[in-house]
């Protein structure tokens, strides 16, 4: 079979959650599995992370998918509800809602629910995306407190905009704003994402929201090394993306390789054609020199990424054969490196794996 393969190590996934809980023993872990479990498979990840205290998803469709397969854990929908029909489903399926705008508050006031709703008040401390301003939040909190449709206490949360930056000025300001505005509010608090989890121990409050680190990937990329050793030592990559060599060719000096003739052989040399391309989710903008792993050694990508194939330089691997597995990222080759080469972030690469990639689960 010549399809690219994403191997998902569920043992590594469980291990990473256990490490997170060990590093923050006083906090509950709210596992972020939005965007199809960061590309790893929504249901697969949820079933593997049964020890999580709750799951975070982006939209109601993701939450309902989990309920349909029997996931009974608390689920919080980060974008909340947008109409009465959705709100009724939240109550029916016991879904938690993030409340971030006045329209949602109005819906709560005018809708008769079959059961009360668990909600989290989103306070915008500087992300300037979703949430009530610091000035608005006390009044909204008091308004929600009077609603018979809402379970008490009300959850209180914010989102950090710049926690992966070595300059801590803005994030410290956000945390200060959050603690100040919630000082007189009663309810569980949640502040940190994956980067905040490592960089701001003072913000490890009632609930933490680990995302990318669950999958064994640094939220800091490769440029912020303060936590590099801890992450490499304690966390394991969950996804390994691989594909097979489908052809080996001996090319002459000055022969060009791939579309646009952007790369030419500096000497007579062997090259391999690997069965993966941007149609599988490998980044088209990955430049020549982007590393792949073949038989435990690094080989560089050469030429443009095609829809279905890439070419690699085999001068360091003269004994390579058709059928050999090539690792594009994962175990032995961090996806953060590929993201850096391609001018993007690991999150995007993981979320863009396409349906034609074969997914295999292992326990290792």
UniProtKB/Swiss-Prot annotation:
It catalyses: L-alanine = D-alanine. Gene3D superfamilies: Alanine racemase, Lyase, Ornithine Decarboxylase, Chain A, domain 1. The active site is at residues 34, 259. Its cofactor is pyridoxal 5'-phosphate. Its EC number is 5.1.1.1. One of its GO terms (biological process) is D-alanine biosynthetic process. Catalyzes the interconversion of L-alanine and D-alanine. May also act on other amino acids. PANTHER family: ALANINE RACEMASE, ALANINE RACEMASE, BIOSYNTHETIC. Substrate binds at residues 129, 307. Belongs to the alanine racemase family. This is Alanine racemase. Keywords: Isomerase, Pyridoxal phosphate. The keyword Transcription regulation does not apply. GO terms for cellular component: cytosol. Pathway: Amino-acid biosynthesis; D-alanine biosynthesis; D-alanine from L-alanine: step 1/1. InterPro entries: Ala_racemase, Ala_racemase/Decarboxylase_C, Ala_racemase_C, Ala_racemase_N, PLP-binding_barrel. The modification N6-(pyridoxal phosphate)lysine is found at residue 34. It is an enzyme of class 5 (isomerase). GO terms for molecular function: alanine racemase activity; pyridoxal phosphate binding.
């Amino acid at each position: 079979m010549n399809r690219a393969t994403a191997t998902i190590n569920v043992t590594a996934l469980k291990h990473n959650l256990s490490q997170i809980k060990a590093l923050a023993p006083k906090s509950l872990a709210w596992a972020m599995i939005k965007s199809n479990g960061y590309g790893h498979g929504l249901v697969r990840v949820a079933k593997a992370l049964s020890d999580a205290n709750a799951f975070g998803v982006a939209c109601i469709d993701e939450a309902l998918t989990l309920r349909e397969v029997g996931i009974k854990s608390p689920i919080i929908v980060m974008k909340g509800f947008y109409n009465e029909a959705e709100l009724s489903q939240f109550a029916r399926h016991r879904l938690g809602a993030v409340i971030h705008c006045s329209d949602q508050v109005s819906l709560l006031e005018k809708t008769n629910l079959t059961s009360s709703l668990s909600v989290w008040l989103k306070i915008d401390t500087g992300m300037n995306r979703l949430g009530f301003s610091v000035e608005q939040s006390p009044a909204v909190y008091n308004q929600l407190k009077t609603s018979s449709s809402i379970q008490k206490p009300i959850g209180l949360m914010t989102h950090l905009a710049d926690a992966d930056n070595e300059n801590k000025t803005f994030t410290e300001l956000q945390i200060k704003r959050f603690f100040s505005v919630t000082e007189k509010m009663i309810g569980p608090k949640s502040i940190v994402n994956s980067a905040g989890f490592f960089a701001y121990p003072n913000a490890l409050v009632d609930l933490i929201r680990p995302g990318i680190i669950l999958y064994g990937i640094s939220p800091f990329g490769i440029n912020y090394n303060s936590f590099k050793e801890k992450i490499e030592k304690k966390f394991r990559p969950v996804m390994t993306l691989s594909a097979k060599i489908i052809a080996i060719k001996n090319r002459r000096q000055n022969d060009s390789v791939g579309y646009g003739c952007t790369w030419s052989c500096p000497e007579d040399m062997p090259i391999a054609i690997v069965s993966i391309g941007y149609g599988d989710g490998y980044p088209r903008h990955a430049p020549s020199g982007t590393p792949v792993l073949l038989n435990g050694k690094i080989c560089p990508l050469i030429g443009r990424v095609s829809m279905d194939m890439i070419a690699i330089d085999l001068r360091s691997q003269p004994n390579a054969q058709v059928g050999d597995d090539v690792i594009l990222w994962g175990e032995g080759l961090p996806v953060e490196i590929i993201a850096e080469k391609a001018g993007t972030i690991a999150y995007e690469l993981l979320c863009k794996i396409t349906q034609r990639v074969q997914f295999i689960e292992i326990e290792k």
